[in-house]
Structures are given as C-alpha cells and as structure tokens.
Amino acid sequence: MLKIRLARGGAKKRPYYSIVVADSHSPRDGRFIEKVGTYNPLLKKDDAARVTLKVESIQAWLAKGAQPTDRVARFLAAQGLVQWTHGNNPEKAKPGKKAQERDAERTQRDADRVAAEAQAKEDAKAAAAEAAEAAAAAAAEAAAAPAPEPEVVAEEAPVEAAAEEAPAAEAAAEEAPASEETTEG
C-alpha cells in the first residue's frame, strides 16, 4: 500500500519534513519512491515556503491509489487536491483499560467507606437507643419501687451518739487483743 507521508529531516529541535510517496512498510525516514513536497514547521503559518507541493505528481499518485496521512491530507485539502474532514474518534478521549480499573476500584472503596460510615452511624443510634431504653427502664423501676420515707428525726442527735459509741468501741478493741495474748501464752 502506498502512502503520501512526512519524512523527518533537519537537526535536533530544528525539524524539516519532506513530503514523500513511500511504501507503508518502509521506515518513516527511510526508503521512499518519490519526493513530492516539503514542510518547514519553523516558518510562520502564512509563509508561502512553509508547505511546497508538486501538485501534478501528487495528483498522479492519488490516481494510482496512494493514501495521504492525516497531516498531509490537511496540506492537500488546503490546495484543493483532496476532501479532508476532521476525524471524530470519541473513543480516543476515554481512559485506558488500567485507568478504568483504577477508577472502578476507587469508586468501590468510596462506596465501601460510605457504607461503613452509615453502618457505624446506625450502630451508634442503636446503642444510644438501647442506652436510652435502659435508662428509661431504670427510671421506671426506681419510680415503681417504694422510696424509703425520710426520717424527720434531728440529724445532730444520732451523730453525737455515734461519736460516743466510736471511742467506746475503740477502747473495747484495745482490750480484746490484750486478753487474747494472755490466753495464748
């Protein structure tokens, strides 16, 4: 299959292209059949020497079935030699297979995290409801149980009586070990 394509020449960072007719299997800058034009991208876009074409030779090769590449087809369309339409490939903008897998994993992780957070909120609500229910049950039990009647007796009298009993108990405790020692010996 014959192609009309660009063959790069020029130095590093200074490109210069030849427009050539070549077999599609030959290397980009390798063997070609005929040179049919030049392209110098360093010149301004409105410069006439930016693209030069041998129109008769190109028409002959197009008649023989040579297919221009996209870039060369643009140059030929500017000269009116071929009809060029902007390619529409919506698949080109889509992410690749691995990127789609990473996105799927990321969305799955996000969904799992959101589900875990929702579950934690539900568990917290359930625990709060149980605690509230337990508190209500405890309050109901406390209300149901008869409350001890507060004594109207003066508080000071029992405190003094308890104070008098405490020294007496201490004295008795001191005497008890002494009596035990004598019985053992």
UniProtKB/Swiss-Prot annotation:
GO BP term, pick one: translation
Pfam families: Ribosomal_S16
UniProt keyword Ribonucleoprotein, yes or no: yes
Keyword presence, Oxidoreductase: no
Biased composition (Basic and acidic residues): 89-125
Comp. bias intervals (Low complexity): 126-146, 159-176
Keywords of this entry: Ribonucleoprotein, Ribosomal protein
PANTHER family membership: 30S RIBOSOMAL PROTEIN S16, SMALL RIBOSOMAL SUBUNIT PROTEIN BS16M
Protein's recorded name: Small ribosomal subunit protein bS16
Protein source organism: Caulobacter sp. (strain K31)
Top-level taxonomy: Bacteria, Pseudomonadati, Pseudomonadota, Alphaproteobacteria, Caulobacterales
Gene label: rpsP
